[in-house]
Amino acid sequence: MPLNVVIAGASGFLGSHLSDELRARDHTVVALVRRPAHSSHESTWDPYAGVYDRAVIEGADVVVNLAGAPTVGNPHSKKWARELRESRVTTTRVLARAIAESERRPAFLAGNAIAWYGDHGEQVVTEESESTGDSLLTRVSREWQDAAEPAADAGARLCLLRTPPVMDRRSAPLKQLQLVTRLGLAARLGDGSQRMAMVSLRDWVGAVAFLAEHETASGPFNICCPQTPTNAEFTSALARAVHRKALLAVPRFAIQAGAGDLAPEALGSINLRPAALEDLGYRFQDRTVGEVIRTGMA
């Protein structure tokens, strides 16, 4: 049955591809925009002022929040860290409350990050695993998730989209990493033993569309390829894909100094599994690091 889907962050890389996929499946997509709406497929909102069209939320079957400032920025900047947090938490809180106050209570697919888990070393991480650590992105992800809870408390179906880096040549991080690798500068981070979760764009889009259409899916979902490589394995696979060698390494101390608040994400390990999605019947097209890279580079 065709759905009415409202998306915040529809103009972003993930949001635009998700919108295209949903429309291809005959669903109607309305984008929340922070400017005057140009068509019936847009609706103006201002999350920082708590302004939105209640009728749009009431008329939705599914609301998706992918809004948020880029994670790429100056990791030593307090302004960057503040925008990173507020752009995610505020938009999620406003939409969760809007859903809670609506009569129909549409499903809420709330963006989140795998940083919620924190560093777990080699331990296999599923949706049942706990959050640990106190890194910037882990703290933000916890607040981000908490902001979505009012929707579930009011009885709405809530799916938390725990997303790792999405590998596609048109977007970070693969866009930058393939250029560096082509120059022969591919380098593992530290000793390269840390697990590095990822997903192809087509699987991320496919999984989120699957959750939008699934009438009973709820809870956290790890949207990642089923076989999580180490950083060294990823670096070698990318080098092979562009016919180069990966012989370099960035020392741990250099990453800690240069990456600032993002160093824990570069050096931490999350051996992630998409257990909840696979239990529901979603089948990944790209299951290994090699498949993710080949699809992302195509």
Protein language model regions, located:
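Conserved Rossmann-fold NAD(P)-dependent oxidoreductase catalytic core, especially the SDR/UDP-sugar
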Residues: 92-134
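Mid/C-terminal beta-alpha module of Rossmann-like enzyme folds, strongest
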Residues: 211-261, 294-297
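N-terminal Rossmann NAD(P)H-binding glycine-rich loop of SDR-like oxidoreductase domains
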Residues: 5-25
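Alpha-helical substrate-binding/gating segment
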Residues: 178-186, 194-228
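C-terminal amphipathic/interface module of NAD(P)-dependent oxidoreductases
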Residues: 264-298
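NAD(P)H-binding glycine-rich loop region in Rossmannoid oxidoreductase-like domains
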Residues: 37, 41-91
